[in-house]
């Protein structure tokens, strides 16, 4: 397992989050979840070995990965491309994808 900086002493990952119902139950119970943003296969492979609960493929990919000045340049095809790459590397973690602006 990878080092988990900033999670503090006594950090306990939440139970497996596999779908929207699990996400909703955690929210209703006041259980905090951890989520990171990811845009590519290799980063997803690394995240797959951590206790992170959920992964977001955000429209910020247009800025971070493609160098645009705004998220308005993200298109459905771009989001589908990055979401597919992350999905292939992520394994069974809960994956959330933004639709473009």
Question: Residue locations for each model-derived region?
Answer:
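N-terminal amphipathic alpha-helix/helix-capping segment at the start of soluble metabolic enzymes
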Residues: 2-37
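Active-site-adjacent beta->alpha loops and helix N-cap segments on the catalytic face
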Residues: 11-21, 68-84
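Acidic (Asp/Glu)-rich catalytic clusters
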Residues: 48-49, 84-92
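Conserved, mostly hydrophobic/aromatic
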Residues: 36, 40, 47, 86
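Glycine-rich, proline-tolerant flexible connector loops at the mouths of alpha/beta enzymes
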Residues: 43-44, 50-80, 99-101
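A cross-domain feature marking catalytic cores of carbohydrate-active enzymes
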Residues: 37-38, 97-101
């Amino acid at each position: 397992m990878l080092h988990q900086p900033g999670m503090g002493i006594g950090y306990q990952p939440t139970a497996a989050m596999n779908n929207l119902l699990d996400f909703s139950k955690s929210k209703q119970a006041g259980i905090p979840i951890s989520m990171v943003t990811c845009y590519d296969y290799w980063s997803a492979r690394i995240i797959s070995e951590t206790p992170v609960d959920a992964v977001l493929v955000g429209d910020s990919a247009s800025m971070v990965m493609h160098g645009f000045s705004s998220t308005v340049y993200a298109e459905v095809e771009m989001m589908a491309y990055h979401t597919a790459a992350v999905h292939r590397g992520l394994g069974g973690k809960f994956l959330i994808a933004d639709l473009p602006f």
